Amino acid sequence: MAKGKDIRVIVILECTGCDKKSVNKESTGISRYITKKNRQNTPSRLELRKFCPRCCKHTIHAEIKK
């Protein structure tokens, strides 16, 4: 049995470019990815460059709260 909190946690990454873009236009949604991270190796918020189908380019996806 595992003790305490799990080391690996599920996090949600959200596109930072879609937020700024959808202010003037109708909301087309926000690109989100689900991944896991190791709490011991990366205690801070995770930021990765991923492809955003809404922006049609690679943008920074940042971790959000659940």
Swiss-Prot record:
Residue stretches in coiled coil: none
Entry annotated with the keyword Zinc-finger: no
Predominant subcellular localization, coarse grouping: plastid
Keyword terms, alphabetized: Chloroplast, Plastid, Ribonucleoprotein, Ribosomal protein
Location in the cell: Plastid, Chloroplast
Keyword Cell membrane: no
GO biological process: translation
GO cellular component: chloroplast; ribonucleoprotein complex; ribosome
Entry superkingdom: Eukaryota
GO molecular function terms noted in the UniProt entry: structural constituent of ribosome
Pfam families given in the database record: Ribosomal_L33
Family label: Belongs to the bacterial ribosomal protein bL33 family.
Record's protein name: Large ribosomal subunit protein bL33c
Taxonomic lineage of the native organism: Eukaryota, Viridiplantae, Streptophyta, Embryophyta, Tracheophyta
Name of the encoding gene: rpl33
